[in-house]
Structures are given as C-alpha cells and as structure tokens.
Amino acid sequence: VRGDDLLNISDGQIQRNSLDPRKVANRILQRLDWAQKNVIPPRGRVPILFTAKAADLLWGTFSAALNGKQVLEGASPWSDRLGEVVTNEHITISQEPEEGPFSCPFDDEGTPARSIVFIQNGILQLFYTDRTTGRLLGSGTTGNGFRPDLGSYPTPELFNFIVQPGERSLKESTTMLDDAIIVDQILGGGAGISGDFSINVELGYRVRKGEVVGRVKNTMVAGNVYTALKQLVALGNDGEWNGSCYTPHVIVEGLSTISRID
C-alpha cells in the first residue's frame, strides 16, 4: 500500500514433480521492481503481451471452439472448418495425457486417453468428443468424456491443454516492443466462445522502446480472441501450467486499450 495506491501481486506453480520456489520469488520481485512507479498507459490499439499467468484468458475461447458438443449445436465458429487454417501458423495446440498435473489413463467412459493434436501450425485437425458426441459427429470418441459431477452424464472436456511454446524469453519479447502493455493479472471473466471480451487489468505495465517503464492503472483491454491470435506477434519459451492449461507468454495485436487518468 502506497497512500491510496494498492498493489497486489500473486504468483505460484502447478507441477507434478518438484517445485521451484526461487523461480516464483524472483518473478514476484521482478514485478515489484517494475511497479515502483505508476505511468500513463497508452491508448488505442497497441501490442499486448499476456504473461503465461494471464494468457489462459485467450485459450479458453479456443478450448470452447474445439468442443464437439459446441460443434453439434452450431455454436463453434469452426464447426465446418476441419482441415482449414483457423488461426496463426505458429500456433499448435495439443492434449498430452501424461504431461501435466491433470493426467489420467482414461476418461469417465472408460476410453483410454491419448495424445491429440487439435490445431497444427494454425490448421484445425480435430474436435474433442465423448462417446455420444463422437457418434453423432461420425468421428468417434477422443477419450474426453468426463462427468461434471456424479449426478451428470459425461460431456466433452479437455485436460492437459498444451500450447506449444515459441523461442523467446520474456526479456527478449519485451525488448522487441516499442510501445505496449504487459498484462500480468486480470479482473473479469473469460471471453467465451464468441471471442469477444473486455477485461480490467489488475496488474499491468507499460513498455517503451523495449524497457518496462512502470505500472499502468485504471486500464481495460478489449477485443476479440480469434482476431487477436490471427495477429499473433510471438509465443514465448516460458511455458507454465495455469490450471490444466500449459501456455507461454503471448504477444498479440488487434486489441484496444481504454484508460482513465486520475
């Protein structure tokens, strides 16, 4: 707390193996250093860097669009686009049953779990299904039939959703930005299957000429997930588990920033 300025920084790790508390502590210290002073945020359309902690906001929309049940209901914008380019060519999304913290040998219908590539280099390969959805689609089950609770029938659900990382570190990605915002923590829900969203930036920073110059406050980011990820600038190499989603940091364009200056 600094006067009437409240700063909240949170971080953590989800791992199947050993944790690295030093890594988490160093990230928190870095964010504290970046937040030493408040700066005026940019307005209009600027590149947005979502850290690995915040990037699952984007991937939740893709997860919904890949759901075979949404395809059957005609809600997915990708319903009739198998084999087509649906996003940036650098994006590959898969499910790995043995890789993450939510690993399982089979789903709630007894179907063995398997490695699946849903999007490869931007091309839509497959939707995930349970037995009922797979039969109706004519594709068969992918082993993704899970019960939300004991009183419910199985429904398609993803687990260990993996976004293939890129090559740049967070520092290298920051260096390539001329004027941008880093979004590290957000307030508000996800985008949903439509892809449209407007979120408050709980913790964000401004980048000028490759350097983080300070913390931005009273700022919102709005736009569409599908549009933004088609205009992907870079994927980082710093993949982290955020729940059941493994994602690196992401730099996108095509989003608008709105701010209030006190």
What do the PLM-derived regions correspond to, one by one?
Residues 25, 81-262:
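Dual-mode signal for accessory low-complexity, basic/Gly-rich regions
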Residues 1-62, 66, 126:
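Internal alpha/beta scaffold segment
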Residues 48, 61, 78, 90-92:
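Aspartyl protease catalytic domain
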Residues 50-51, 70, 189-191:
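Alpha-helical protein-protein interaction elements
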